[in-house]
A protein has these predicted regions:
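Alpha-helical substrate-recognition element adjacent to the catalytic core
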Residues: 1-103
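C-terminal cap/substrate-recognition subdomain and adjoining C-terminal extension
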Residues: 65-194
């Protein structure tokens, strides 16, 4: 299987839902000062190795971060011992911070990956901060036999957001895939290992 993962607020704390905090984080931090969410490196290493431990499952990163952060993100992944893989980022421009449809970039690139590896099932990993659950639901519905599991890191604990994700869990269930709302990487890793 392959893995398609978001980066911001999934692998690394970026404060995407708070634009001011996000801008300050981008401007005032670097690959040495930014920190991954606890347990991310071990979880992604285990996914890459697979159940038997001897696989080399590919990991793709699809993010709405700008291409000018590419070097920082690659160095960050190396420093944190998070498996490397292709990073599909967005072009920088006026639309980047205030785009009404950031999901177009993600959905388009996820489809390209799925169509480039037509016989490979995938695990999708994202967060509840913005639109990852809805984007991944759409992907599961379009490719129902291709997505094994969707892991969503719970970063938005608002009751309305949690209720919306509960609804998405039920929408995905009939496809044979599942959406797992994970409080942390340890929970997701335990679920994946089961």
């Amino acid at each position: 299987f392959g893995v398609i993962s978001d980066i911001d607020d999934t692998v690394i704390s970026s404060h995407v839902t708070n634009k001011l905090k996000m801008i300050l984080t981008v401007l005032l931090s670097n690959e040495h000062t930014r920190k991954p969410f606890e347990g991310v490196a071990g979880f992604y290493q285990a996914l890459q190795r697979g159940a038997g431990g001897g696989e080399d499952n590919p990991i793709f990163y699809v993010s709405n971060s700008a291409w000018n952060l590419y070097s920082l993100l690659v160095e960050f992944l190396k420093l944190q011992k998070i498996p490397l893989g292709p990073l599909l980022l967005r072009d920088f421009g006026d639309h980047l911070l205030f785009s009404k449809e950031p999901e177009h970039h993600k959905k388009k690139n996820i489809k390209i990956i799925l169509e480039s590896f037509p016989h490979l099932p995938f695990v999708l990993i994202g967060d509840s901060g913005e639109r990852d659950p809805e984007i991944y639901r759409d992907v599961v519905k379009e490719y129902p036999t291709r997505i094994r599991t969707v892991y969503i890191r719970s970063v938005n604990k608002q009751p309305t957001r949690l209720a919306a994700i509960d609804k998405l869990i039920e929408e995905i269930r009939p496809t044979g895939s599942q959406l797992v709302l994970a409080p942390d990487s340890e929970f997701a890793a335990a679920h994946a290992a089961a």
